[in-house]
């Protein structure tokens, strides 16, 4: 989406897979981009493993930190914290605040950008920037098949998912949209069941609880906007879950940053082409929408993905996945403070129910994988 989108999505009984960071905790970017299982070295999944469900052990991943993921070109005055705890705190602040604020940035950008064009252009140029950044690290270059697979996955995760989110947010408030995006893991459970994985009763309870929360959010809360907008956002969540499921079965580039850059840029390119063919045009450009667009591209897509990559590699699953619960709350608060959105009792109730259902879904997924 414009998200994202966090931890392992409950999609299959396949061996642990790599995840490349991005749009996913739930933000307007939603969840990180998953890597193909074929690319992941085999590891033992023990309860003490300091990795996300579905993520290879930090030792098995490319040494992203050693390849200077945070080094900035030139003599940029910003200095990163010297300690590990300081860098983790900084990465958490970036992921929490940036991905939680991208919903407001999308809202402001839509004053000048058509929805699909916004999704396409921001991700196209963000992906190109990440690709240039990755190229400076002398990465392992992908094969043609890996590029093709990255394009297919990126089209679902970025083109369709982010485009539908932006389309829905024309009529749905930012906080409501963020809470609805948090349902991605629930849709991932349904897709996994359709694909043949045995789903525990508790996981179905989580899905049902999430649907109750969605119903409360849309039928009890006047801020939920139009039905068409809400359906568009939910479709975006389905596309993201489907793209993540597909990514777990395709061979993607082994280098994390290269894979992320390709998925973002190629998905953005597809969205831009579709937007142009469908007649979307930028008629006029306001100063505020343009600044919001730059924020989405440079901070929401590029900086936040690098920060999430650091969390995946250097923290526990609980810490790394905490953005799944913090981002919707941040989005609701920012919408109320800066956009005048009303926080009703229905918003609070629906948010608590949906986040509880997501937590239940993750708990059963961790349990199934032997991580709890």
PLM segments and residue spans:
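C-terminal-most transmembrane helix of multi-pass membrane proteins
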Residues: 2-15, 32-34, 43, 53-54, ...
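Juxtamembrane helix-entry segments on the extracytoplasmic side of multipass membrane proteins
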Residues: 83-89, 111-120, 142-148, 204, ...
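Transmembrane alpha-helical core positions of polytopic small-molecule transporters
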Residues: 96-100, 153-162, 184-185, 214, ...
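Specific transmembrane alpha-helical segments of multi-pass solute transporters/efflux pumps
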Residues: 98, 102-103, 131-177, 181, ...
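Small-residue-rich packing faces within the transmembrane alpha-helices of Major Facilitator Superfamily
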Residues: 100, 124-128, 211, 265-269, ...
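Transmembrane alpha-helical segments that form core, pore/gating elements
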Residues: 116, 130, 187-189, 194, ...
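Helix-helix packing/entry segments at the starts of transmembrane helices
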Residues: 119-121, 162, 177-183, 246-269, ...
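Hydrophobic transmembrane alpha-helices of multi-pass small-molecule transport proteins
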Residues: 130, 153, 183, 199-219, ...
């Amino acid at each position: 989406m414009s998200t994202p989108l966090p931890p392992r999505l409950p999609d299959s009984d396949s061996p642990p897979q790599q995840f490349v960071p991005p749009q996913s905790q739930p933000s307007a970017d939603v969840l990180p981009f998953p890597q193909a299982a074929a690319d992941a070295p085999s590891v033992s999944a023990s309860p003490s493993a300091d990795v996300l469900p579905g993520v290879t052990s930090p030792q098995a991943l490319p040494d992203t930190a050693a390849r200077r993921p945070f080094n900035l070109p030139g003599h940029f005055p910003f200095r990163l914290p010297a300690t590990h705890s300081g860098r983790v705190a900084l990465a958490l602040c970036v992921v929490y605040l940036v991905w939680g604020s991208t919903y407001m940035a999308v809202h402001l950008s839509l004053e000048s950008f058509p929805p699909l064009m916004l999704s396409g252009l921001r991700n196209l140029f963000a992906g190109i920037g990440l690709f240039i950044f990755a190229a400076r690290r002398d990465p392992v270059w992908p094969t043609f098949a890996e590029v093709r697979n990255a394009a297919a996955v990126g089209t679902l995760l970025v083109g369709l998912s982010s485009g539908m989110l932006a389309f829905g947010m024309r009529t749905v408030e930012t906080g409501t949209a963020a809470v609805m995006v948090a349902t991605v893991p629930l849709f991932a459970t349904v897709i996994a069941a359709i694909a043949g994985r045995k789903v525990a009763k508790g996981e179905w309870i989580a899905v049902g609880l999430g649907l109750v929360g969605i119903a409360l959010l849309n039928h009890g809360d006047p801020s939920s906007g139009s039905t068409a907008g809400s359906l568009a956002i939910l479709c975006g969540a389905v596309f993201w879950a489907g793209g993540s499921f597909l990514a777990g079965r395709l061979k993607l580039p082994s280098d994390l940053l290269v894979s992320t850059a390709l998925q973002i840029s190629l998905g953005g390119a597809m969205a831009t082409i579709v937007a142009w063919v469908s007649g979307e045009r930028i008629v006029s450009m306001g100063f505020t929408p343009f600044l919001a667009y730059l924020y989405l591209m440079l901070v929401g897509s590029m900086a936040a993905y690098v920060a999430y990559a650091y969390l995946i590699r250097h923290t526990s699953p609980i810490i790394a996945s905490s953005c799944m619960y913090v981002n919707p709350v941040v989005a609701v608060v920012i919408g109320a403070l800066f956009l005048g959105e009303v926080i009703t009792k229905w918003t609070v109730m629906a948010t608590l129910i949906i986040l509880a259902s997501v937590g239940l879904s993750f708990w059963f997924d961790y349990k199934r994988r032997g991580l709890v």
